[in-house]
Structure formats: C-alpha cells, structure tokens
Amino acid sequence: MAKYEILYIIRPNIEEEAKNALVARFDSILTDNGATVVESKDWEKRRLAYEIQDFREGLYHIVNVEANDDVALKEFDRLSKINADILRHMIVKLDA
C-alpha cells in the first residue's frame, strides 16, 4: 500500500460543527473508495502567504492515508475542488 499525506485549508469563519462535519465527510470519502485513514488531525489556524477568496487565514487539516490505488485520492481531489469550504488542498505521496 502506498502512503499519502493530504493537507487542506478550510475557510476560517466556518462554525465548529460544520468543520467537524466537513472533516468527517472527506474522511468517509477516502474510506468509502478503498483507502485507509491512518490519522486525521487539525493542525492549526495559520496566516496565509497571500489572500485566498478574501481570506488572510485558514484552518489547516492533515490526513495520512494508505491506499492501493488512486481512486479514493482522485475522488477526494474532485470533490475538494467543488467544495466552497476548502480553500486549497494538496496530496503528496510519501516515500515507502
């Protein structure tokens, strides 16, 4: 299984309940498509290097994932591009 790290930035003015629901939804997208979520944790609220959609700060969330193929990652990528609460995301394959 290949190991991946996903980092995504959530808009800072989201309510706590909505943020938890968003994180749970995107974790389930990964698991429903065959990936295993090893760890999913909030990093911190950080100042952005440049303004994104009129926001100067963002809530960073990190997910470590193991997957046999990239089906779950492609679905995560597709849906995170559509979601207005996620400002940016990045998927990185970790060395084995």
Swiss-Prot record:
One of its GO terms (cellular component) is ribonucleoprotein complex. InterPro entries: Ribosomal_bS6 (IPR000529), Ribosomal_bS6_sf (IPR035980), Ribosomal_S6_plastid/chlpt (IPR020814), Transl_elong_EF1B/ribsomal_bS6 (IPR014717). Transmembrane segments: none annotated. GO terms for molecular function: small ribosomal subunit rRNA binding; structural constituent of ribosome. It comes from the Bacteria. Pfam families: Ribosomal_S6 (PF01250). Keywords: Ribonucleoprotein, Ribosomal protein, RNA-binding, rRNA-binding. GO terms for biological process: translation. Belongs to the bacterial ribosomal protein bS6 family. Binds together with bS18 to 16S ribosomal RNA. NCBIfam families: S6. PANTHER family: MITOCHONDRIAL 28S RIBOSOMAL PROTEIN S6, SMALL RIBOSOMAL SUBUNIT PROTEIN BS6M. This is Small ribosomal subunit protein bS6. It comes from Streptococcus gordonii (strain Challis / ATCC 35105 / BCRC 15272 / CH1 / DL1 / V288). The gene is rpsF.
